[in-house]
Amino acid sequence: MEKSNNSTLFILLGFSQNKNIEVLCFVLFLFCYIAIWMGNLLIMISITCTQLIHQPMYFFLNYLSLSDLCYTSTVTPKLMVDLLAERKTISYNNCMIQLFTTHFFGGIEIFILTGMAYDRYVAICKPLHYTIIMSRQKCNTIIIVCCTGGFIHSASQFLLTIFVPFCGPNEIDHYFCDVYPLLKLACSNIHMIGLLVIANSGLIALVTFVVLLLSYVFILYTIRAYSAERRSKALATCSSHVIVVVLFFAPALFIYIRPVTTFSEDKVFALFYTIIAPMFNPLIYTLRNTEMKNAMRKVWCCQILLKRNQLF
């Protein structure tokens, strides 16, 4: 059967039709977007300009911050523009591009979080072999695998959606183009496609989440034999990552591990992994991390001293 696509334009319904609420949301999301850029750039500069870049934990954190910036930038700018626009429209081509990029960078983020959990597992459960196992070559390989996994995931979502005909209503009950809200507009039987989407998005999120949980079960089992001081240090290192994982995975699992259907709450849950998690990640990873705080002080104190020397 040939694809018959009469929809060349989609209308994004967003959060509200009330103009006052939209202006308030614009100010809020503008603040969030600026905070995301400032926080994640601060993390990246502090890591790359110090010796922390040579430690696997911070090597992955650097790439997590980069993926956060890319991921939120596929959604937030368009969302802010729509909040001030009279008609919240997006062309079919741009919708497909947004679908691909959000799942590409979202997939990368999921796999990097899994890689970071593996790094913590090796550091705590196999400390004597840590430097050998987590070599720079191994870290680079993990990042390449994360990017490849993200591409395969997003390409699958893209291919499953691009051949679906859209010839009926063109209103997407969301603030960006995602698979489930789009499939709701399809004018053909999408039962099999829905199962494939669940197998792709749902299972990836579920399997990686289970792997993350298992890694921390092994970590908790291992640190039982540690002294109180070592146990406290190990838990402090892992707690930041656990908070980020829950913040990102819990809403993603709620949305993607169910049959093809949408709820009005999906838009709120999607905010957690598209805007809230990228905004809080820098704060979560630096709040209880002495090394990260010291690196920031070192970088920015050097910058202040350089500026003073230039003035005098």
Curated annotation (Swiss-Prot):
All ranges on the Extracellular side of the membrane: 1-23, 78-98, 157-193, 257-267
Topological relation to the membrane, as annotated: Multi-pass membrane protein
PROSITE patterns for this protein: G_PROTEIN_RECEP_F1_1, G_PROTEIN_RECEP_F1_2
UniProt keyword terms in alphabetical order: Cell membrane, Disulfide bond, G-protein coupled receptor, Glycoprotein, Membrane, Olfaction, Receptor, Sensory transduction, Transducer, Transmembrane, Transmembrane helix
Disulfide-linked positions: 95-187
One term of GO molecular function: G protein-coupled receptor activity
Cross-referenced Pfam families: 7tm_4 (PF13853)
SUPFAM superfamilies on file: Family A G protein-coupled receptor-like (SSF81321)
One cellular component term from this protein's GO annotations in UniProt: plasma membrane
Chain ranges on the Cytoplasmic side, renumbered to this chain: 48-55, 119-137, 218-233, 288-312
Glycosylation sites: 5-6
Membrane-spanning ranges: 24-47, 56-77, 99-118, 138-156, 194-217, 234-256, 268-287
Alphabetized Gene3D superfamilies for the sequence: Rhodopsin 7-helix transmembrane proteins
Localization of this protein: Cell membrane
Broad class of the protein's primary localization: membrane
Family to which this protein belongs: Belongs to the G-protein coupled receptor 1 family.
Protein task: Odorant receptor.
PANTHER family: OLFACTORY RECEPTOR
Name of the protein: Olfactory receptor 4P4
Organism whose genome encodes this protein: Homo sapiens (Human)
